[in-house]
Amino acid sequence: MTLTDLVAHTARQLAQAGVSFGHGTANAHDEAAWLVLHALGLPLDTDLADESWSKQPLTADQQAQVAILLRARIDSRQPLAYLTREAWLQGVPFYVDQRAIVPRSLIAECLAEGSIDPWLSAQTHRLLDLCTGNGSLAVLAALAWPEVSVQACDLSADALAVARINV
């Protein structure tokens, strides 16, 4: 079985199992690609169309690694991000676990495209991220505006523990 075959097989299994998407991926194929690449220790930006990867035969051990993660995803119904302990937002990886929700936010898109910039002025020196969860928006804001002091807070001590890992 090749990498391409395994991604297709994994996507079919996810679709047949009826798992939910939306915690980093929008469909079975994208989630399968993430699952397979993570399980095999390959970069998530691996070009699956590149024949040097896509046609490469996989060992039985590699297929078993993918099968273990796939089974955990289907049986637990947990977002893949919780199983891999990693979520990506605007191209930035964040640690995540069940103590905070998987980051996904329209605000992150606004930060990336600069549509919040007009609301800032030369007098903007501080930003507060309320209900920070895993801290991803605070990190993205600090990256977008390095001259602004960003503070993050949350009522949940568990969520703050996750945020500390990411900042």
For each feature predicted by the language model, list its residue ranges.
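N-terminal auxiliary segments of SAM/dcSAM-dependent transferases
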Residues: 1-89
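Generic helix-packing signal
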Residues: 14, 36, 43, 142-146, ...
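SAM-dependent Rossmann-like transferase core, predominantly class I methyltransferases
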Residues: 54, 64-165
